[in-house]
């Protein structure tokens, strides 16, 4: 009998267990496609970023011009840049949908996998933030100034911390150089953590829409889910191509077409759309330190979700009460995203404050209480 090399070769064996002979639940829906889509996004971002880095100059006198040079003079530079800029937006769309799937179907009960996922989200946000500074436009400069300045809210060490990150007394050449270094380094750290994320996931196996043990009904990953993922790849590449070729500046800020000028402040300083929900939470608290802590907690609250799970059932598929609150959370997230892009005036401030309170209340009080109530209703039957 012929020896199957993919099952015996030390390297191919690892790949085989992860991508070919991996036992997967037979009933996982399209919501389970986003993990592989995130992997594709990461590969696209690393490759396009590598080619951009070959032509980019991390110097405040040349950064803006080098980006213009990439778009005008480099062969298909405009395309590489548009794919990289819009690929970041698609990356965040996929990760938010991936997290929403995890919350809806109770995947967060795989605590190690979930917590590494939250760290991955934080690293992705850090990478996107430092990357947004690199073109050295008006919003790049002022975004960097405002967001890094938030660290000065920490008592005693705040001001020293800000100057240490800036590499001086203002956002200057040293800041841009180190941000470029971080932007180059962090995706590889994300790649390494993704491998660990998968390692922990394959220890337990995937969850499924019913939230029950599916060991009795598993099928091999290839060909069933590899082709299913491939369909997702084509759909995502179609959306990315449409965005990059027809509407490349749809999700950007017009202010960033103006070279950075420390003497002129833009009328509305706001980050990219994928940070707006956290930015709205930050702005809704009048105290600077309180705002910064709320901003951090708005992301790290996800780490508390496994501890706040009170229901006897894992998935929300048979829990209509929790389902309502889940969709309220989704609506709340969208409202916060909208508010984050609006000027700081009434009625936006009030709506932002109500949405911020609702955001934390849904995670910390309402959804755990709904789970407890559902347990009581079940015990009555």
UniProtKB/Swiss-Prot annotation:
Its cofactor is heme b. Heme b b562 binds at residues 84, 183. One of its GO terms (cellular component) is mitochondrial inner membrane. It is found in: Mitochondrion inner membrane. The keyword Mitochondrion applies. It is a multi-pass membrane protein. A ubiquinone binds at residue 202. Keywords: Electron transport, Heme, Iron, Membrane, Metal-binding, Mitochondrion, Mitochondrion inner membrane, Respiratory chain, Transmembrane, Transmembrane helix, Transport, Ubiquinone. GO terms for biological process: mitochondrial electron transport, ubiquinol to cytochrome c. It comes from the Eukaryota. InterPro entries: Cyt_b/b6_C (IPR005798), Cyt_b/b6_C_sf (IPR036150), Cyt_b/b6_N (IPR005797), Cytb/b6-like_sf (IPR027387), Cytochrome_b (IPR030689), Cytochrome_b_C_euk/bac (IPR048260), Cytochrome_b_N_euk/bac (IPR048259), Di-haem_cyt_TM (IPR016174). Its main location: mitochondrion. Component of the ubiquinol-cytochrome c reductase complex (complex III or cytochrome b-c1 complex) that is part of the mitochondrial respiratory chain. The b-c1 complex mediates electron transfer from ubiquinol to cytochrome c. Contributes to the generation of a proton gradient across the mitochondrial membrane that is then used for ATP synthesis. The cytochrome bc1 complex contains 3 respiratory subunits (MT-CYB, CYC1 and UQCRFS1), 2 core proteins (UQCRC1 and UQCRC2) and probably 6 low-molecular weight proteins. Belongs to the cytochrome b family. Heme 1 (or BL or b562) is low-potential and absorbs at about 562 nm, and heme 2 (or BH or b566) is high-potential and absorbs at about 566 nm. This is Cytochrome b. It comes from Prionace glauca. The gene is mt-cyb.
């Amino acid at each position: 009998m012929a020896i199957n090399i993919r099952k015996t070769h030390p390297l191919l064996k690892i790949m085989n267990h992860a991508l070919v002979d991996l036992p997967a639940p037979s009933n996982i829906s399209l919501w389970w496609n986003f993990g592989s889509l995130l992997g594709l996004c990461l590969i696209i971002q690393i490759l396009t970023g590598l080619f951009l880095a070959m032509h980019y100059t991390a110097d405040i006198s040349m950064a803006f011009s080098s980006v213009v040079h990439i778009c005008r003079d480099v062969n298909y530079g405009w395309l590489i840049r548009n794919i990289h800029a819009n690929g970041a937006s698609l990356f965040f769309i996929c990760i938010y949908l991936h997290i929403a799937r995890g919350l809806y179907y109770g995947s967060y009960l795989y605590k190690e996998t979930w917590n590494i996922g939250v760290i991955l989200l934080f690293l992705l946000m850090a990478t996107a933030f430092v990357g947004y500074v690199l073109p050295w436009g008006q919003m790049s400069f002022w975004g960097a100034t405002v967001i890094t300045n938030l660290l000065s809210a920490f008592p005693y060490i705040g001001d020293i911390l800000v100057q240490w990150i800036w590499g001086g007394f203002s956002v200057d050449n040293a800041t841009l150089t180190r941000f470029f270094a971080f932007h180059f380094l962090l995706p590889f750290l994300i790649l390494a953590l993704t491998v660990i994320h998968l390692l922990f996931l394959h220890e337990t196996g995937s969850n499924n829409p019913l939230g029950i043990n599916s060991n009795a009904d598993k099928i091999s990953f290839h060909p069933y889910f590899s082709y299913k993922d491939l369909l997702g790849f084509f759909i995502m590449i179609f959306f990315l191509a449409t965005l990059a070729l027809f509407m490349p500046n749809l999700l950007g800020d017009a202010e960033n077409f103006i070279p950075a000028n420390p003497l002129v402040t833009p009328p509305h300083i706001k980050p990219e759309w994928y940070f707006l929900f956290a930015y709205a939470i930050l702005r809704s608290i009048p105290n600077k330190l309180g705002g910064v802590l709320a901003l951090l907690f708005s992301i790290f609250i996800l780490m508390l979700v496994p501890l706040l799970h009170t229901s006897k059932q894992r998935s929300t598929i048979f829990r209509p009460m929790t389902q309502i609150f889940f969709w309220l959370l989704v609506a709340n997230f969208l409202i916060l995203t909208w508010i984050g892009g609006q000027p700081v005036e009434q009625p936006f401030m009030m709506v932002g404050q109500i949405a911020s309170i609702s955001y934390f209340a849904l995670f910390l009080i309402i959804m755990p209480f709904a789970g407890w109530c559902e347990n009581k209703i079940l015990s009555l039957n």
